[in-house]
Amino acid sequence: MPKILCLHGYGTSASILQHQLGPFMAAADPSYEFVFLEGEIECQKAQGLGPFVKGPFLCYNESFAPADIQESCDLIDEMIQAAGPFDGIIGFSQGGSVALSYLLQRQIDGHPPPFRWAVFFSTVIAFAPNDTFGSNILANLTDHEIRLLDGYPATDLSSLHPLTRALCETTAQTFYSAKTGGFISPNTPIAEFSKRDDPSQPRVFHPALLGDRIPIPTVHITGRKDNSLMVGLSVLVQGLCDQRLIRSLTHSGGHNVPRSADDVRAAWAAVDWAIQHSQKQHIW
């Protein structure tokens, strides 16, 4: 029986994701088992949820500091030990970010992935769970560079070194997009570049900053009506995956999972492709 681990978005819950994925799961092979990983931290209600949706509203991490990201990754390990093994992993929004962080850090550490394939719905950038990632860039930020970064998005960052832009501008853009779009709480701790290489400093996984790639088939699905900056981040993280093993598509909605019949059919066609290609691999 194929088993799939599912991670929800910020400000929702396992039960809410189960409802969101209703049409998608209804179209699945009846033998598939969907297992939902619940976040452990209460937070504000996610943007776009109807007034009658009841909490608790949960997330996987309160901040994007490496230690908090590691705790989120630990939840996946604990679920694998308790209910695994799993064939695939599905992540929506923040859940996709956590899944990406987990898979990429395992690849960096030289461990084989515990999943054969992955699906990312409207995911956002992945953050490093290791506080040594990007240290050489953060530790050497000049006062001038810090002033430019603190002024984002009003300042011109074109003068920054390409790798500094990859790490720091992407971090600044992520927080700006997420906060202005209402995708995370206004009280979420942001990157403070004046701290330079402080262990609490968030560090984004950017394709330009590392050579490791997620080695399993991945499917990336965004909404045509989603926030354009958030879609840009979803596209960026595709660069963290093996380009030979990617399928990407767009559904007709916004920051959500596919729900119309046509969108669900297209999503499953991509997932079936990923499953078929995963069976040809020998990395386990």
From Swiss-Prot:
Pfam families xrefs: FSH1
Induction, per UniProt: Expression is controlled by the asperlin biosynthesis cluster-specific transcription factor alnR.
Active-site feature positions: S93 (charge relay system), D226 (charge relay system), H255 (charge relay system)
GO molecular function, one term: hydrolase activity
Origin: domain of life: Eukaryota
Stored InterPro entries: AB_hydrolase_fold (IPR029058), FSH-like_dom (IPR005645), LovG (IPR050593)
Protein biosynthesis found in the keyword field: no
Disulfide bonds: none
Gene Ontology, cellular component aspect: cytoplasm; nucleus
Keyword Hydrolase recorded: yes
Pathway(s) where this gene product acts: Polyketide biosynthesis
Application in biotechnology: 2,4,6-octatrienoic acid is a particularly interesting compound because of its potential as a natural tanning agent for human skin. It is a promoter of melanogenesis and antioxidant defense in melanocytes in vitro and in vivo, topically and systemically. Pigmentation is a powerful protectant from UV damage and skin cancer, and octatrienoic acid is an attractive natural photoprotectant.
Gene Ontology biological-process entries: secondary metabolic process
EC number(s) on file: 3.1.2.-
Alphabetized UniProt keyword annotations: Hydrolase
Protein family according to the UniProt entry: Belongs to the LovG family.
PANTHER family: ESTERASE ALNB, ESTERASE OVCA2
Role: Esterase; part of the gene cluster that mediates the biosynthesis of asperlin, a polyketide showing anti-inflammatory, antitumor and antibiotic activities. The first step of the asperlin biosynthesis is the production of the intermediate 2,4,6-octatrienoic acid by the highly redusing polyketide synthase alnA with cleavage of the PKS product by the esterase alnB. 2,4,6-octatrienoic acid is further converted to asperlin via several steps involving the remaining enzymes from the cluster.
Name under which the protein is recorded: Esterase alnB
Gene this chain is encoded by: alnB
